[in-house]
Amino acid sequence: MALRTTAMGAVSATLVAGGVLGLTPAAQAATGGVRYVDIAGDGGTVLKANVVTPADTDGTRRHPLIVLPTSWGFPQVEYLAQAQRLADSGYVVLSYNVRGFWQSGGEIDVAGPHDVADAAKVVDWALAHTPSDPENIGMAGVSYGAGISLLAAAHDPRLKAVASLSGWGDLVDSIYSGRTQHVQAAAVLDTVGTVAGRRSAESQEVFSAFYSSDLSKEKDIVAWGQKRSPATYLDQLNKNGTAIMMAGAWGDTIFPPNQSAAFYERLTGPKRLEFRPGDHATAELPGLFGLPNDVWTDTERWFDHYLKGEDNGIDREQPVRLKSRSTSGYEGYPDWKSVNATRNKIALAGSTTIHTNVDSGADGGIVFLSSILDQVAKLPPVAAIPLLPRRWAAVWQSGKYATAQQVRGTAKVHTTVTPTQESGTLVAYLYDVGPLGLGKLVANAPYTFHGHTPGKPFGLDLDLFSTAYDVPAGHRLALVVDTVDPLYIEHNPSGARLTFSSPANDPSYVSVPLRGQ
């Protein structure tokens, strides 16, 4: 119950923002040229929507169409500020409330087949009732709307371009990476769905099974998630040749960057990938209020090029654009591989045993709050590395760096683990450690195992969540491993222990990706 209360508090600002916007439709309709409509979605389910058209629409010509499905828990007026801006530059813009939320009918399908079919019905309606150009159709969204946009593009070749903002490529790898439940992230989604929507029996069953840690239902949960993952339909997306822009945040606690980057690398059509500091949807949130915003500016440029044919240069820029958590400038790369091209290995020498079931003090933070603090104040979660109790935390450190180290991409941990029980969970953290021993969190990731023989060593490979962070000269990097973190559900039997070793024929290490100096 405490966890759900925390989750509710974490999203309260988001819901308040949605509520404030939700009070304004009548005024907007009267003064802003917004038309509110009902659209029959899949199976006749009513979808509440609004349409904004260019001011110079005269019925003699057609305009490119952009469809905007709403975010999880947001009302249909979420995108009005951006819709008006896009309409002013010549687009027909149709925003609609996804099924199961607010005034739209039906139950929450969690980006399932009904949501995909709804998106096609919305496009059908727009082509029949607005001056939209059937040859130039785009779809964009934030969070839930982003995932639905990608799924719709895989199933509807009419979609020529997509902008996925804080979306996902692999839903399973988002909230179940390392075979570990990301419980705070799931609780946020579950709580918002309960408050602002109508959950289906299927979604309630999936969330209950997710929380319960019932391994007999694991295959069903994974299959459910794969059906809702754009990565499952990559062949269709590539065949359609949809121009896909993806933007996300380094600290996204709902849809971490790794799964988006992996999805991006497998796309073969026109594509662009952007990562910035922040948490889920926080980078693009100001744009929803009409404030200047890099994410929305690039989104409009993307559509201008691929729907209007404007030669604005976006197709000639480096397609991977990153902003470090430590600096304000952007860096360009030809692909995601190039971000991780240079690596430095830190040896995880010796043998160390830790006990489980107790939080050592090393944590990934609190969903939303921690990454927002990192975004606006450069204050990531911290830990006093010398004071971490070695009974519950294994610690390895590099030497001091004579020059600044620009960590870019995905740090990888390789080690050998000997458990005393067949199941267990560990969480690895990479810290930037200053002269006084205070560690600032650079990256982390959980790992859960089942079915191992107690007392028998096994090799473990774990990718930490991707990031861009600058370690100052004179600092060290430290890898900390413990077994409890409030972000995740742990699977350590009471009294279990984990031993980490570094065999001569298979040494343990953490491989840190560094930008070429």
Cite the ranges covered by each PLM segment:
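Gly/Ser-rich "nucleophile elbow"/oxyanion-hole loop immediately N-terminal to the catalytic nucleophile
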Residues: 55-62, 107-115, 121-143
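Short substrate-entry loop that stabilizes the transition state in hydrolases
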Residues: 57-63, 68-103, 253-256
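Accessory cap/linker subdomain of secreted extracellular hydrolases
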Residues: 140-142, 151-239, 310-311
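Short alpha-helix in the alpha/beta-hydrolase fold that links the catalytic acid
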Residues: 242, 256-264
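Short beta-strand/loop motif that positions the catalytic acidic residue
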Residues: 240, 245-248
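Secretory targeting and sorting signals
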Residues: 1-29
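N-terminal cap/lid segment of alpha/beta-hydrolase-fold proteins
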Residues: 30-61, 401
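C-terminal, loop-rich substrate-recognition/catalytic regions characterized by aromatic stacking residues
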Residues: 274, 282-283, 288-517
